[in-house]
Amino acid sequence: MMEEEELEFVEELEAVLQLTPEVQLAIEQVFPSQDPLDRADFNAVEYINTLFPTEQSLANIDEVVNKIRLKIRRLDDNIRTVVRGQTNVGQDGRQALEEAQKAIQQLFGKIKDIKDKAEKSEQMVKEITRDIKQLDHAKRHLTTSITTLNHLHMLAGGVDSLEAMTRRRQYGEVANLLQGVMNVLEHFHKYMGIPQIRQLSERVKAAQTELGQQILADFEEAFPSQGTKRPGGPSNVLRDACLVANILDPRIKQEIIKKFIKQHLSEYLVLFQENQDVAWLDKIDRRYAWIKRQLVDYEEKYGRMFPREWCMAERIAVEFCHVTRAELAKIMRTRAKEIEVKLLLFAIQRTTNFEGFLAKRFSGCTLTDGTLKKLESPPPSTNPFLEDEPTPEMEELATEKGDLDQPKKPKAPDNPFHGIVSKCFEPHLYVYIESQDKNLGELIDRFVADFKAQGPPKPNTDEGGAVLPSCADLFVYYKKCMVQCSQLSTGEPMIALTTIFQKYLREYAWKILSGNLPKTTTSSGGLTISSLLKEKEGSEVAKFTLEELCLICNILSTAEYCLATTQQLEEKLKEKVDVSLIERINLTGEMDTFSTVISSSIQLLVQDLDAACDPALTAMSKMQWQNVEHVGDQSPYVTSVILHIKQNVPIIRDNLASTRKYFTQFCVKFANSFIPKFITHLFKCKPISMVGAEQLLLDTHSLKMVLLDLPSISSQVVRKAPASYTKIVVKGMTRAEMILKVVMAPHEPLVVFVDNYIKLLTDCNTETFQKILDMKGLKRSEQSSMLELLRQRLPAPPSGAESSGSLSLTAPTPEQESSRIRKLEKLIKKRL
């Protein structure tokens, strides 16, 4: 009974003392201990075993028990000491809290005393300084009153003096005095309710009005609207009057400027009236020479009369430009039928030169409030005439490099006067566009005539792949037209010129490039094997001569150059045309045309080499392969194919050296054309003996090696063939080899033969299978059962086919057949 109670007590104690892992970890960190009794996972059995590891150690059990009891007594003493120490902790805490509260109350009392003393000090300071503030206010008001009285005295005296000086036209003194009076009057805006102040303000306004009318009358007298200018330079009175006008209402200044410029240009309107001979475009230089003389005359006579900030010389020039633009537009509308392209370009050139002269002479500061910005807003940094005009030699060099731009120099700032006069020519630029249409048509006709007269370019391996000279000439002319037209306008005329460019790019592609590609001819059939194989260097089997092959390559290189340059041309046109018209610039159709020429050229080269190899393939299919008795060197038809490849490919490669990617395209297209054709002729070789199949397999491997080496054949520099091309050749020729391996395999047992076919040819089908059976010379009755077996086994997955196909060509076949294939493979390796 006692034992049960003790067990229950221990369980309750363990349940009460069960701590969470976090608490246990915290205790271990605060009170680190190496004693096993302090561990949370204490195990009494393990602890006893450590104390008494052997039976012999039990002899010391009494000593160990005494030590443990002594340790327990020490722990009990420590616990009692700690418990007694905690008896008065609560009382001590309450006492400390009461002391803290008393200290806080004392602190609040001291703070309140300090606050009361501060308020008393503030009140004392206010009482002390009350009289001083009143004195400060009095001083400030007195100062303001004195200042206002002084201003009033100055204003009254100034108004009297201003009225007197105005009557005596003493503008020099008036200019200084008026500005002072205006400044003083600003101080009295808040006193306008006082009658005397309002009266003085009205007198100032009246004096300003009188000054304005008086100055305008003086200028009208000095520079009358009707009649000629009075001799002699300007008077000092007018110079001082301009200083006064600067202070008066801005309308007075504008009226003076308007009257002076109108009087200054009155002679121009008379000299260059519409009915005068000098008014026409052919004498446009005289207009600009006249204004240049007038500007010089102005600087000499009137340069010091007007303030510098008025920019009178620039204003005269700008007004001259506006008048000239209107007069030229009117006279060109009247005499539109007399405008010729040379005359128009002459006038535009002289006008743009004059606008450039204005840009160098003046800053354009007077144009901010004018109409120029509305007239012309060219895209930034695209005016070609702000750059140095390149020489024709530089243009040709740049064009040959495929770039329409010269090495760019730092661009000059925009011309603020661009278009201020030349804008009037834009409605008549159709004359220029029509002229360029005619000139380009004649240029294309000349290219055609020159090609017929001079013939195709002479073959030259050192300059292989050079573009036709006419191409460079065309784009040089295009650049000249584009630069010239962008000088004239960046609006609709540029769109019209782009349409002309498109027209003659297509004509060049059709008449010069496509029109001069050699035509292919078909060869006659019915030739014997011996005649088909009589092919030596210089034979007529190849359809194109050396000159024709070079011509095709030149046309291809030219088309590639045109394609790249047309793309650059489109970009430059978009740079130069107005932003709102960029979307209407699109030369994609013309680039597609040149791409078509490139494709046609490559196709011609492929067809030519393909056709040259046709007789050899025909000879292959006509040979009696069942009569071949032994495997020898490569067959004559293989030698013939290799001969044609070595004749054509180096020529094409050398002439397409500058367009390597299109030579690669040629190789790929030839492989895609030749290999299927070779396999087609391979199926025609029937029936075939075992030895004949071995010979064909050897020939096929030889052709495969030649095709893999095709891109660098007969080249001193051996380059690795492109991976895409190698993949096509390996895939196609490996299929041909697999077909021959199937042909070489015995057709019995049937299951093994069919499984071999499925294994070796991944694209296996009944049609190919029947062709292979025909090559083996099997009868139709034998073929039917084999075809039926193939149909049954085709749906099987590739893995099953491979597992069943473990009966490979060598393993399940008779010993004699496997030895033949091994011999053939050794022969191929020996040749390599």
UniProtKB/Swiss-Prot annotation:
Annotated Gene Ontology cellular component terms: cytosol; EARP complex; endosome membrane; GARP complex; Golgi apparatus; intracellular membrane-bounded organelle; membrane; perinuclear region of cytoplasm
Residue positions, PTM N6-acetyllysine: K110, K360
InterPro entries in the record: Vps53, Vps53_C, Vps53_C_sf, Vps53_N
Residues recorded as bearing Phosphoserine in the entry: S377, S580
Positions where Phosphothreonine occurs in the chain: T391
Coiled coil, from the record: 97-138
Highest taxon of source: Eukaryota
Acidic residues bias locations: 386-397
Entry membrane topology: Peripheral membrane protein
Subcellular compartments: Golgi apparatus, trans-Golgi network membrane; Endosome membrane; Recycling endosome
Biased segments, Basic and acidic residues type: 398-412
Disease: Pontocerebellar hypoplasia 2E: An autosomal recessive neurodegenerative disorder characterized by progressive cerebello-cerebral atrophy, profound intellectual disability, progressive microcephaly, spasticity, and early-onset epilepsy.
Assembly description: Component of the Golgi-associated retrograde protein (GARP) complex, also called VFT (VPS fifty-three) complex, composed of VPS51, VPS52, VPS53 and VPS54. Component of the endosome-associated retrograde protein (EARP) complex, composed of VPS51, VPS52, VPS53 and VPS50/Syndetin. EIPR1 interacts with both EARP and GARP complexes and mediates the recruitment of the GARP complex to the trans-Golgi network. Interacts with VPS50 in an EIPR1-independent manner.
Stated name of the protein: Vacuolar protein sorting-associated protein 53 homolog
Gene: VPS53
